[in-house]
UniProtKB/Swiss-Prot annotation:
GO terms for molecular function: beta-glucosidase activity. Pathway: Glycan metabolism; cellulose degradation. Glycans are attached at residues 66, 304, 438, 621. Gene3D superfamilies: Galactose-binding domain-like, Glycoside hydrolase family 3 C-terminal domain, Glycoside hydrolase, family 3, N-terminal domain, Immunoglobulins. The lineage of its organism: Eukaryota, Fungi, Dikarya, Ascomycota, Saccharomycotina. It catalyses: Hydrolysis of terminal, non-reducing beta-D-glucosyl residues with release of beta-D-glucose. This is Beta-glucosidase. Residues 408-568 form the PA14 domain. InterPro entries: Cellulose_deg_GH3, Fn3-like, Glyco_hydro_3_AS, Glyco_hydro_3_C, Glyco_hydro_3_C_sf, Glyco_hydro_3_N, Glyco_hydro_3_N_sf, Glycoside_hydrolase_SF. GO terms for biological process: cellulose catabolic process. It is an enzyme of class 3 (hydrolase). SUPFAM superfamilies: (Trans)glycosidases (SSF51445), Anthrax protective antigen (SSF56988), Beta-D-glucan exohydrolase, C-terminal domain (SSF52279).
């Protein structure tokens, strides 16, 4: 089609065709109207990489650092480059729409998807979102900013009612979306599951029409989160353009036609309005086909798995890393120290959080591998303590045939798919699908096959392989399912997940609790493993995740006390040691929130024992949101490494060895303990609602207002060099603020980057205001001794307004203000006062 004319096509569509465009046809595709040349459009997760169209057996992809890590770069140019790379990844999957970035707020540290979003600060979150969206859409790929709005916890997320003041809604939770619309104009926005002040977001006229469409003049497409549509008429009338996934539940021809024919429900104009926005999204895709080369329903490939991709992922991961402590400049060295490695995350490939952010990565470099790569030789290692939430690893540690070499081709398990359960199969029944499984966490809810009815995905999987222990000892096997499962070892049933099921956290909270069995195994002996799995409809639990999924695991049992002693002995034996600890994609995941800020299991005991044995041990933490460090005063060197994507291990090694001078800054405040955080009393859905009791005082706004100390403040991060900052010029007009800041690298050894952070304070406001608020930042790279001037231009109304609930408008108060420039919210190096002579009121962008 040479010209995709939205209005012309709208006029030519019949009613049934229009209705069909109001919902997806499956998990990842919109409806094709062949008669009019309207193509199907493929969408794909997600926030830190492009999975493609399969949770199960998906084509590998590049994995980026998680959202809080990306925002900790404080680098708009780098984030735009990351968005461009995400677009290239999307093109390799023939997906025209990326379901990201995630732009919700961290009210507190426990949110299951807190790692996915950028920041506790709405300005940083909004500008990070804008940069990533610009990168994506500049390459012709549509972005989807999500989840609109107040989707800030997982507890009862489909029904939870977020009770939030109008001022907090505007200043904190809507603000990142407003900034994204203003600066990047995303093609799509995804609505949230939850309610806000009584109305489901996916059918809220106030949010979708009054604010997004009328006030902000946004003209993109609104899609639901998956299974996040709750009505037919209200959602159509109030602005939700398309329901995901398909097949539709709420927008069948019968339901929509009934609503059209019922008095005071919806009109043909309402349907046309929704279809028009879907067509505008498709127009964006079609108009960019020459640039993207995307093929409708085309194959998915790993063509973007290149050295250039790896190098950029490594750069992004390294620049996200935050140096938290470096007492006596212990890490300020470029020598090739032979670090000996300890810790549960050292050999784990903790590349991302869980849920929609998880994916089958091209590869993942573990921290241990990164250090070995840097040194060119193996180093001593011990685990010290386990930190898993549940046991995985069966597929990763099994062989298809133990008699053959243990290479990549022979690694994993064979999965055979059948229409009947094993006890009902005839001897000659052949599987309708056979594949190899390399990952133990298997999600099948988007599995498609001609033999499987998508509305009732009833099938069975036989999983087989061989496990060969590397040591004598006790081993723990595990199984959890959404569906049903039986785990056999040498044809003996060891775990039953078919009968007497108990609900647990698996499969977004729809599946079972983990069940385990400890067995004594012999080194080198071949053990036949078999799992008989029945798909989602066979589950004894009520849930709605289609074909479901399963996770089978095995791990060597350890004596915790003995392992901690081993770790301390290793640390004491060597001058240089690094301890890699943290969370993973089970502790931080979509579907549920963390219960506390604790490091898992006996991690803290491990850290204390190692630090006592060797105080110079470098601690590296991996998490997407804060954890408690009860041993903080004892640590001399501490690094926050987030979930670093494919290149996490190489990036960590680059920072430890001084090849990259750390330049990340914390995208959220780091409290000492859970009870300190602003949402402590209100981070749970109770009686169907969650009260945003901290109001506008989120993150550092709260800590500063209460003068409550934190372990590490917002915007904080050390370097291997030092900097000076000073405001050299400052001008205020009726609508602009211009700030010039001189920045000097005062070190003589390392080039490095510093982030100039600009905060504003209202000194005599008539309403309660934060002590200060971030409204500008700029990253600058300097050679030793070099000085540069950074110029930052801001709109006056964006810098100092608050939302006046009484008037329903933004309000710039006449009065006195303070601009503060520093390297964190707690390290202000230069200030200037200024005055605004008259009040200003405004709405919109």
């Amino acid at each position: 089609m040479s010209k995709f004319d939205v209005e012309q096509l709208l006029s030519e569509l019949n009613q049934d065709e229009k209705i069909s465009l109001l919902s997806a046809v499956d998990f990842w595709h919109t409806k094709k109207i062949e008669r009019l040349g309207i193509p199907a459009v493929r969408v794909s997760d997600g926030p830190n990489g492009i999975r493609g169209t399969k949770f199960f057996d998906g084509v590998p992809s590049g994995c980026f650092p998680n959202g809080t890590g990306l925002a900790s770069t404080f680098d708009r140019d780098l984030l735009e480059t990351a968005g461009k790379l995400m677009a290239k990844e999307s093109i390799a999957k023939n997906a025209a729409v990326i379901l990201g970035p995630t732009t919700n707020m961290q009210r507190g540290p426990l949110g299951g998807r807190g790692f996915e979003s950028f920041s506790e600060d709405p300005y940083l979150a909004g500008m990070a979102t804008s940069s990533v969206v610009k990168g994506m859409q500049g390459e012709g790929i549509a972005a989807t900013v999500k989840h609109f709005v107040c989707n800030d916890l997982e507890d009862q997320r489909f029904s939870s009612n977020s009770i939030v003041s109008e001022r907090a809604l505007r200043e904190i939770y809507l603000e990142p979306f407003r900034l994204a619309v203003k600066h990047a104009n995303p093609v799509c926005i995804m609505t949230a599951y939850n309610k806000v002040n009584g109305d489901h977001c996916s059918q809220s006229k106030k949010l979708l029409i009054d604010i997004l469409r009328d006030e902000w003049k946004w003209d993109g497409m609104l899609m639901s989160d998956w299974f996040g549509t709750y009505t037919t008429a209200a959602a159509i009338k109030n602005g939700l353009d398309i329901e995901f996934p398909g097949p539709t539940r709420w927008r069948t021809r019968a339901l929509v036609s009934h609503s059209l024919n019922s008095r005071e429900q919806i009109t043909t104009e309402d349907v046309d309005d929704r279809v028009r926005q879907v067509l505008k999204m498709i127009k964006f895709v079609v108009d960019n086909l020459e640039k993207t080369g995307i093929v409708e329903n085309g194959p998915e490939s790993t063509s973007n798995n290149t050295k250039e991709t790896s190098d950029l992922l490594r750069e992004i991961a390294a620049d996200s890393i935050v140096l938290l402590k470096n007492k006596n400049n212990y890490l300020t060295s470029k020598e090739r120290r032979q670090y000996h490695v300890i810790g549960p995350n050292a050999k784990a490939k903790t590349s991302s959080g869980g849920g929609s952010a998880s994916m089958n990565s091209y590869y993942v470099v573990s921290p241990y591998e990164g250090i070995v790569n840097k040194l060119g030789k193996e180093v001593d290692y011990t685990v010290g303590a386990y930190s898993h939430k549940s046991i995985g690893g069966l597929a990763e540690s099994s062989l298809i045939d133990a008699a053959k070499p243990a290479d990549a081709e022979n690694a994993g398990l064979i999965a055979k798919f059948y229409s009947n359960p094993v006890e009902e199969r005839s001897e000659d029944e052949e599987p309708f699908h056979v594949t190899k499984v390399n990952r133990s966490n298997v999600h099948l809810f988007d599995f498609k096959h001609e033999k499987v009815d998508p509305k009732n995905p009833y099938f069975f999987v036989t999983l087989t392989g061989q496990y060969v222990p590397q040591e004598d000892g006790d081993y723990i096997f595990s199984l959890q399912v959404y569906g049903s499962g039986l785990f056999y070892l040498n044809d003996e049933l060891i775990i039953d997940q078919k009968h007497n099921q108990e609900r647990g956290s698996f499969c977004f909270g729809a599946g079972t609790k983990e069940r385990t069995k400890k067995l004594t195994l012999k080194k080198g002996q071949v053990y036949n493993v078999r799992v008989e799995y029945g798909s989602g409809p066979t589950s004894g639990l009520v849930g709605e995740f289609g074909a479901g999924g399963f996770q089978a695991g095995v791990i060597k049992a350890i004596d915790d006390d003995e392992e901690i002693r081993n770790a301390a002995e290793l640390a004491a034996k060597h001058d240089k040691a690094v301890l890699i600890i943290g969370l993973n994609g089970e502790w931080e995941t979509e579907g549920y929130d963390r219960e506390n800020m604790d490091l898992p299991k006996r991690t803290n005991e491990l850290v204390r024992a190692v630090l006592k044995a060797n105080p110079n041990t470098v601690i590296v933490n991996q998490s997407g949101t804060p954890v408690e460090f009860p041993w903080l005063e004892e640590a001399n060197a501490l690094v926050q490494a987030w979930y670093g994507g494919n290149e996490l291990g190489n990036a960590i090694a680059d920072v430890l060895y001084g090849d990259v001078v750390p330049n990340g800054k914390l995208s959220l405040s780091w409290p000492f303990k859970l009870q300190d955080n602003p949402a402590f009393l209100n981070f749970k859905t109770e009686f169907g609602r969650v009260v945003y009791g901290e109001d506008i005082f989120v993150g550092y706004r709260y800590y500063e207002k209460l003068q409550r100390k934190v372990a590490f403040p917002f915007g904080y991060g050390l370097s291997y060099t030092t900097f000076e900052l000073d405001i050299s010029d400052f001008k205020v007009t009726d609508d602009k603020i211009d700030i010039s800041v001189d920045v000097k690298n005062t070190g003589d050894k390392f080039a490095g980057s510093e982030v100039v952070q600009v905060y504003f304070s209202a000194l005599n406001s008539k309403v309660s205001r934060p002590v200060k608020e971030l409204k500008g930042f700029e990253k600058v790279h300097l050679e030793p001794g070099e000085k540069k001037t950074v110029n930052i231009e801001l709109e006056l109304k964006d810098a100092i307004s608050y939302f006046n609930e009484e008037l329903g408008k933004w309000h710039v108060e006449a009065g006195e203000y303070l601009v503060s420039v520093g390297t964190s919210s707690d390290d202000i190096l230069s200030v200037k006062e200024f005055k605004v002579e008259k009040d200003l009121y405004w709405k919109g962008l």
